Structures are given as C-alpha cells and as structure tokens.
Swiss-Prot record:
This is Imidazole glycerol phosphate synthase subunit HisF. Pathway: Amino-acid biosynthesis; L-histidine biosynthesis; L-histidine from 5-phospho-alpha-D-ribose 1-diphosphate: step 5/9. Keywords: Amino-acid biosynthesis, Cytoplasm, Histidine biosynthesis, Lyase. It comes from Edwardsiella ictaluri (strain 93-146). It is an enzyme of class 4 (lyase). The lineage of its organism: Bacteria, Pseudomonadati, Pseudomonadota, Gammaproteobacteria, Enterobacterales. The gene is hisF. It catalyses: 5-[(5-phospho-1-deoxy-D-ribulos-1-ylimino)methylamino]-1-(5-phospho-beta-D-ribosyl)imidazole-4-carboxamide + L-glutamine = D-erythro-1-(imidazol-4-yl)glycerol 3-phosphate + 5-amino-1-(5-phospho-beta-D-ribosyl)imidazole-4-carboxamide + L-glutamate + H(+).
C-alpha cells in the first residue's frame, strides 16, 4: 500500500503566499521560499504552489521563484498557474518543478491534458478541479478563474463528469478543490469525495476544509483519498505536520513519519 501524503498548499499572488476563505478575501501569509523550507523541514510529503491570478491575468506562473524553491527544498513540488502549452510546462519542469498542474487552461482546451501527458508522462500531469456544491439544485459544478473574485464563473461541467473526462485525456492525478469548504476549517466534504472516489481511478487529493487532525483521518479512512492538501492550518501553525502524521499512524493510516 502506498503511503498517504500530507501536502501543504501555498497560494501565490504578486510574489507572496496568500490565503483566503472560499477563494476570496486573501491575506498575505509570507514569503515563498522560507515557507517552503519550513514545510519541508517539518515533514511535508510534497508541496503545491498555485499562482492564483495567472490564468485570469492571461500569463504563466513566474519562473524565478520556482527555481529558488527547487534550490531550497528536497521534496517534490507541483506548480500551477496559467500553463497553456507544452513549452511553458517544460520550462517549469526544467526550473525544478516535479509536476505541473492545470485547471482553467484545461477547461479552455482539454486537449492540453493529453499533449502534456504524451510529452512528460502522466506522473507529471495534475489536473486541479474547483468544485462548488449548489444546495438549491443539489449539484456539484466546476468553476474556473477562481483566483480572481471578479472573474470567477461556473462552467457547464458537472464535477463527476469532468473528473472522468480529464482521466480519459491523460491526467495522472486530480486535486479536488472544494470551494464551499475552503478556509472554513470545518472538515473536507466527505460526501463529494466519496462520490468522486467512486469514479476516479488515478490518485485523488482532497483540498478544502481541513481544521483538525480528525478531518485528515476522515478523508483517508472514509473517502480513501491518496493525499490531503491544506493551507491555513499549516500557515497559522494550528496543526503541526509531525504531530498530524503521528496521529494518523496511530489510527492506522499508512504514512511516512518524519
């Protein structure tokens, strides 16, 4: 059995790490490289960096900090933000990223997923999916351009359908960003995770809602996700990664201890 992964998420805007609530009202957390180094030292299994306004601004993630992160840490990391071509992805990988993640660009041009997988291998290609549960219609809908409140909009895709589509096109991993839960620390959306797990054949990463060690345990034990991503609880040191991993191991989760 593969070990489950604990993955701090660093949202980047204007060269700094920020964090919002439900993808809005972002506050500055700190500088990129010191935070990355801290999480690596604390025992994170990998890191994810989202340049949250790159897609909405029509640009690609800033490569200068990617190289600095690669020089500072010795754990895998994934980079996302406005990657629209094989060439742009290749440059980020050449600067030291281990994986690249696409979200809004995949919605705009789904064939990009296949081209990236064919060029770099599925193990390098992550698709991020921003999903919002609409209580009125009791449906889960994919959103795009979520890094910019003014430009965020719903797509025509139901979440489960898009999950199956990106797998068919070559996604090697899926990060499910549950927008309703983002930053509120009330727990991952287990209902949605379980539904997506049933149709997801590739590694599935839960994102949005972690507020206590029990929330990570529930995602692993009930929804059988492969990794759990979180931001504010790590940024604000509400949860220590080493302590979290020991708690999970004591509760039967296969995890790499620090």
């Amino acid at each position: 059995m593969l070990a489950k992964r604990i993955i701090p998420c660093l949202d980047v805007r204007d060269g700094q790490v920020v964090k919002g609530v439900q993808f809005r009202h972002h506050e500055i957390i700190g500088d990129i490289v010191p935070l990355a180094r801290r999480y690596a030292d604390e025992g994170a299994d990998e890191l994810v960096f989202y340049d949250i306004t790159a897609s909405a601004d029509g640009r690609v993630v800033d490569k200068s900090w990617v190289a600095r992160v690669a020089a500072a840490i010795d754990i895998p990391f994934c980079v996302a933000g406005g990657i629209r071509s094989v060439k742009e992805a290749g440059l980020l990988l050449s600067y030291g990223a281990d994986k690249i993640s696409i979200n809004s660009p995949a919605l705009a041009e789904p064939t990009l997923i296949t081209r990236l997988a064919d060029r770099f291998g599925v193990q390098c290609v992550v698709v991020g999916i921003d999903t919002w549960h609409d209580a009125a219609s009791d449906s889960d809908r994919v959103y795009q351009f979520t890094g910019d409140e003014a430009r965020t909009r719903a797509t025509a895709w139901q979440t489960a359908d898009w999950v199956q589509e990106v797998q068919r096109r070559g996604a090697g991993e899926i990060v499910l960003n549950m927008m309703n839960q983002d930053g509120v620390r009330s727990g991952y959306d287990l209902r949605q995770l379980e539904q997506i797990r049933a149709v997801c054949r590739v590694p599935l990463i839960a994102s949005g809602g972690a507020g206590a060690p029990e929330h990570f345990l529930a995602a692993f034990s009930q929804a059988d996700v492969d990794g759990a991503l979180a931001a504010s609880v790590f940024h604000k040191q509400i949860i220590q990664i080493g302590e979290l991993k020991r708690y999970l191991a004591l509760n039967g989760v296969e995890i790499r201890l620090c």
